[in-house]
């Protein structure tokens, strides 16, 4: 359980990075085992590779990047330069901005190979850092996660039609070779509620050996609906999935989740603090929650979610989802029936983008502010390749057609003539 979709996305990136580090460390160990009896001089290409990686290293003292890389390369054990022992570089991702307090999003994850250390050690590997690849439609928290973890800025693929097209993702991935990748797809975009083509994106991620994360904070509850769950085909192929029931789950904040296929996927979060999860206590059966969250001090947010699931069940939530999706489609039909209004596109979830026919961006923004200032309606705004649109995000499963007509009447009444 997390504070919301933002923290879930950040946690997904953290797990992807830790998975990458572990894979790289395993490869390094295998190389050291293989080459331990056959010392060899570094080739020019190897030295150039280290220089490239060293450019990403955070320096300390007066060392140059090459000084640091060379010390890690030789394992700082007095090993002659010609020996391949101890390939190491400092992990740039282990350095992020500090935050006060105990309940923040930690940017220095504990490494489970040292389960009893009080502070997270720095992980080391010679490979390049994790590279995130996402669409321009991705939530801003994906970019923030890269910043928090000290990763390179995400490669952002244009999404002119609002979804991440497989051909565009393939072109981007083809230019990213020799580095670990995390492909991020979205199931319910912030602007329009659009859903990326998950099966095709999952195929591409697998073909390029990339991790696959789906941000389903908005659209994830379609899984409850027998009518609409097909829109999330391919979600089961993700390594991590973000869900947030404060959106289309009718929960007060916070109500976020990060879902993984297997509890063992959360192993990088393992941490030992004797006063919380001493070995003998956990062996005796006491619950250990440190490996299930980045936060130690947290509210019992799971309680309200558990009560809702218990009271409504799968069918009850599915009914609310279906009713709300139907209301959004009704609103879209009502917009199309009025010559004075234009619809951006048929809704996928419960977000409807529309505006007065022919209205420019200034007019759309003015209408929205007037409705808000007068206390008549709260509409969002969304900028697409075709300009600015009013955004109606429907979350009331009991909205009636007359309610929706009244909203459109208000928009028309506040449109400058």
Locations of regions flagged by a protein language model:
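PLP-dependent aspartate aminotransferase-fold enzymes
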Residues: 1-41, 45-110, 114-179
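Conserved PLP-enzyme active-site core in the AAT-like
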Residues: 8, 14-20, 119-264
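PLP-dependent enzyme catalytic core of the Aspartate aminotransferase-like
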Residues: 208, 384-417
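Active-site C-terminal subdomain of aminotransferase-like
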Residues: 233-339
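Short beta-strand-to-loop capping motifs
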Residues: 260, 354-358, 394-396
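Conserved PLP-binding catalytic core of the aspartate aminotransferase-like
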Residues: 342-371
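Conserved PLP cofactor-binding pocket of PLP-dependent enzymes
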Residues: 346, 351, 374-391
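A common structural junction motif
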Residues: 371-379, 411-417
